[in-house]
């Protein structure tokens, strides 16, 4: 029996976020291209070395990237939009696709399945010449071999998932384009095999949600590839859910190994194996350590899983691996010594997960007695945190038990509420606003750091925040915005800020993960029962409102987003944690309202990303996600206007859910998706307040008034003007002041032009 340890992917960002800092230094011309490439190589090889030292046998190569692995694949295969043809160097083209340029919009960015990682959407254009433009996996494979003596496992995104994630083609064209991918994949795999690659991981996460016809179509492509590359050892890797519905066909694919997720797809994959077995001539790669959360594994449960598998499958060859790439977890917990012992002991970041894989390998190859001490330690750790006071609050249980049906709905329907709100708020047609945050300048970040390290006092920090708030209230008034925001200068992160002020949360010092490009986030850890403590946003919001006659929005992050952007305890259902957060936010919203705040925005940008991959599981998730939002927002008076915001999603999947949220106004990120949501609204009605983002805030370019006016014009073809709002795509925290002010001026002018046209036509 052969059993090996493997990893599917390692976090890119570096232990101290060296990767992020190198990228941003290069973009701001602080280092040249040679320095950039040299530093990136050092980081890349260090990651390989860490995995080697941890005892991982099959080390992923090619999972490292300068921005995004899907973008890497698009560039490699020649999926380069013609608008970037003026750029000649690899890095210029690559980063223009990712970030846009002065004259060209970036490629669309969207969520990687149901995670908080974002990928760059490949674009297909008519006449595109698909070919292997650059065999990057080969270069990196040879680099690891030469520099470190590591015979790694090249990792590539599979052809079917790649094309399914791309856009720009019709459904009728899909099969033809898919066949065109065979030749470059054959060349890629042939060259890797010729260079000595013992096993090549081909990621096909899309397989968890395909129809039977699609899986058969994918199989034919793999058969065509296998025919040309008969000797390459391929590991077909799935993750994020089970492949239960198509398992019977998938195990007949012409590959040597198949990787299955036994964490997020455990039940479905076990059901399929018990029904159909597993081929004796293939290796089963068992995703048994959670690659998406930060908790220590239950080693007893994992070993029980292997016992069950060994009795149900024909193969004797196994690979022990995480459920997915460790991209979604922080790198190492060793710096988190400030945490309580019970919490610290319960954590496992990427490096600890690698150690867990080696422990499991030892138990499987040498017997459980070889890790008896570790097993006992793990059992004690799990018992300690399960029985902790933080996870057993009677007040939280009582509040949950007391909930009634009327706690989940507003007193009046939208149409009647909105009329009352129009009278109270006195806003113009097509009101303008922003999504919430304004630039977190170097001065803002430095001052916050000085406050946190005790260099300046609480009072000095509060005075600084008030000064920034007043400055931006005046900017907004001068620009001519209708509904203002306080700017969120006191907040580092829209989830972390609330977590720091609620019971049940804890925070890491260095628990960073990549969100998109160089943007990293440090998700809170929800380890206990969540409960309200004190007002979280009252002081800053009320202060901002005192500075102006215009309406100032209260700004909160919604319960589902706080849930989906946190590392969540895994001992109770996510629904229950979401309800706990909603009850805490409900208290805060009531305090804002009683303090005179008449518009309150509860952002849910992550509502869509939490949806299960399989459509059959959507309804259950959407039901409790919507109920969580309603629980948080439904206790306000009819005259109080509730806003929400969403971004980067396939909204057509959740239009009904958006409607069910019963928000008075929803703002939706649309500019970067090049009008896809506008097309969705052509086929369905949305008769509540809505703002479709008129410019992409993720790019440094300042869009013209005419660009924004065009989006407004297109939007008004499908939206009722009396309910339509005009706003940017997202918050402006990451932009510079000199980018924000002219962009908002152009936006307000576009709104004025649109109002004038509507009045003329009327």
Curated annotation (Swiss-Prot):
GO terms for molecular function: 5-methyltetrahydropteroyltriglutamate-homocysteine S-methyltransferase activity; zinc ion binding. Binds 1 zinc ion per subunit. It is an enzyme of class 2 (transferase). Zn(2+) binds at residues 645, 647, 669, 730. Keywords: Amino-acid biosynthesis, Metal-binding, Methionine biosynthesis, Methyltransferase, Repeat, Transferase, Zinc. GO terms for biological process: methionine biosynthetic process; methylation. Its EC number is 2.1.1.14. This is 5-methyltetrahydropteroyltriglutamate--homocysteine methyltransferase. It comes from Bacillus cereus (strain ZK / E33L).
């Amino acid at each position: 029996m052969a059993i090996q340890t493997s990893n599917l992917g390692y976090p890119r960002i570096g232990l101290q976020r060296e990767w992020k800092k190198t990228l941003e230094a290069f973009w701001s011309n602080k280092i040249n291209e040679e320095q950039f490439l040299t530093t990136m190589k050092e980081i890349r090889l260090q990651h390989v070395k860490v995995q080697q030292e941890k005892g991982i046998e099959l080390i992923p190569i090619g999972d490292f990237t300068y921005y995004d692995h899907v973008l890497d694949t698009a560039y490699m295969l020649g999926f380069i939009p013609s608008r970037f043809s003026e750029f000649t160097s690899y890095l210029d083209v690559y980063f223009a696709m990712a970030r846009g340029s002065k004259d060209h919009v970036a490629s669309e960015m969207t969520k990687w399945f149901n995670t908080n990682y974002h990928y760059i959407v490949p674009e297909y254009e008519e006449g595109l010449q698909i070919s292997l433009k650059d065999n990057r996996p080969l270069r990196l494979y040879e680099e690891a071999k030469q520099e470190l003596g590591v015979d790694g496992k090249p990792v590539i995104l599979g052809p079917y998932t790649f094309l399914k994630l791309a856009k720009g083609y019709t459904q009728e064209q899909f099969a033809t384009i898919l066949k065109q991918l065979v030749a470059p994949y054959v060349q890629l795999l042939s060259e890797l095999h010729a260079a000595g690659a013992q096993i090549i991981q081909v990621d096909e996460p899309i397989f968890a949600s395909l129809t039977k016809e699609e899986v058969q179509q994918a199989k034919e492509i793999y058969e065509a590839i296998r025919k040309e590359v008969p000797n390459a050892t391929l590991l077909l890797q799935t993750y994020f859910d089970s492949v239960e519905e198509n398992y019977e066909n998938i195990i007949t694919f012409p590959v040597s190994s198949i990787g299955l997720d036994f964490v997020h797809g455990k039940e479905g994959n076990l059901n399929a194996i018990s029904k159909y077995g597993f081929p004796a001539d293939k290796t089963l790669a068992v995703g048994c350590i959670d690659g998406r959360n930060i908790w220590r594994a239950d080693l007893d449960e994992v070993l029980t899983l292997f016992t069950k598998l060994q009795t149900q499958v024909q193969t004797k060859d196994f690979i022990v691996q995480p459920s997915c790439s460790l991209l979604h977890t922080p790198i190492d917990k060793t710096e988190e010594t400030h945490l309580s012992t019970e919490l610290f002991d319960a954590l496992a970041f990427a490096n600890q997960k690698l150690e867990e894989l080696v422990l499991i390998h030892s138990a499987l190859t040498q017997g459980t007695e070889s890790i008896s001490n570790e097993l006992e330690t793990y059992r004690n750790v799990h018992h300690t945190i399960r029985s902790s006071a933080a996870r057993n609050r009677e007040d939280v249980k009582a509040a949950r038990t007391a909930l009634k049906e009327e706690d989940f709905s507003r007193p009046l329907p939208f149409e009647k509420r909105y009329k009352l709100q129009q009278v109270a708020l006195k806003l113009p047609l097509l009101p303008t606003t922003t999504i919430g945050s304004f630039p977190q300048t170097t001065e803002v970040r430095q001052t916050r750091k000085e406050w946190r390290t005790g260099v300046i006092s609480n009072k000095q920090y509060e005075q600084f925040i008030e000064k920034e708030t007043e400055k931006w209230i005046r900017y907004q008034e001068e620009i001519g915005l209708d509904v203002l925001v306080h700017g969120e200068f006191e907040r580092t992160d829209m989830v972390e800020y609330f977590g720091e002020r609620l019971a049940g949360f804890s925070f890491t010092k260095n628990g960073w993960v990549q969100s998109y490009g160089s943007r990293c986030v440090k998700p809170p850890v929800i380890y206990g029962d969540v409960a309200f403590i004190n007002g979280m946003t009252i002081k800053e919001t009320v202060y901002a409102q005192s500075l102006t006659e215009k309406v100032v929005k209260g700004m909160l992050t919604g319960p589902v987003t706080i849930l989906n952007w946190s590392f969540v305890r895994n001992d109770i259902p996510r629904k229950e944690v979401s309800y706990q957060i909603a009850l805490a936010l409900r208290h805060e919203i009531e305090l804002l309202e009683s303090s005179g705040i008449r518009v309150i925005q509860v952002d849910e940008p992550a509502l869509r990303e939490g949806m299960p991959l399989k459509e059959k599981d959507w309804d259950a998730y959407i039901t409790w996600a919507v109920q969580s939002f309603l629980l948080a927002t439904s206790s306000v008076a009819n005259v109080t206007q509730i806003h929400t915001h969403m971004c980067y999603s396939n909204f057509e999947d959740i239009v009904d859910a958006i409607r069910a949220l019963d928000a008075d106004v929803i703002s939706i990120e649309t500019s970067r998706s090049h009008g896809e949501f506008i097309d969705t609204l052509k086929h369905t009605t949305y008769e509540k307040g809505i703002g479709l983002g008129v410019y992409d805030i993720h790019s440094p370019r300042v869009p013209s008034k005419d660009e924004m006016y065009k989006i407004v014009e297109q939007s008004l073809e499908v939206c009722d003007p009396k309910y339509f709002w005009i706003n940017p795509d997202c918050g402006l925290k990451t932009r510079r002041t000199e980018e924000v002010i002219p962009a908002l001026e152009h936006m307000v002018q576009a709104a004025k032009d649109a109002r004038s046209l509507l009045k003329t036509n009327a």
